[in-house]
Amino acid sequence: TLDHLRHVAVQTNKEWAERLGVQQSTAITCVKPSGTVSQLVDSASGIHARHSQHYIRTVRGDNKDPITQFMADQGIPAEPCVMKPDTTMVFSFPIQSPKNAVTRNDMTAIEQLEMWLIYQRHWCEHKPSVTITVKDEEWMEVGAFVYKHFDEMSGVSFLPHSDHTYQQAPYQECTKEEYKELLKKLPKKIDWEKLSSYEQEDNTIGMQTLACSGDVCEIVDLT
């Protein structure tokens, strides 16, 4: 089925590229939603399962970023980053997965890898990225899988299944009671109209990148 769907997608792109007189896209198929979009729409990311039924999602913010100060002033639970306490703030958001959602606790590391391999072989024209959570007793089996499929392994990261390995990890499993307690600490309403008062200067200049090839960079003057 995935092979057929990929073929239809590629052929449709080819047909419309010819009609419009443009080049055919290099890659058509991919896995969505992306990590960022999944946070905005409250869904699992790509081919990943949900972290757990209840978990805390931490987000880091640069202290120089206006939205970091804005969020702190609005009362969103925050604490200094343990690695960079002077420059970075860590915000915590309680998340509840939908009822009957598949979580990482429902899948073994090998099942996660096998799903990734199916989409790589039969759907994606590029290498889909995935983070595999591995229990202590699964590492040897995972190592054997990587060795067997070594020539296909790309875009795969591994993390210990335990949440206690890293402080302030991006995803931290919690109980239903802990979820409810943190939920009470969130502000009932965020006044986004006040954000503009924090943005008194352009902080994006340093983050801009130029499209460069060789010794030439493309700069478009929009003024």
Residue ranges and their predicted role:
Residues 203-223:
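Short acidic, low-complexity intrinsically disordered linear motifs used
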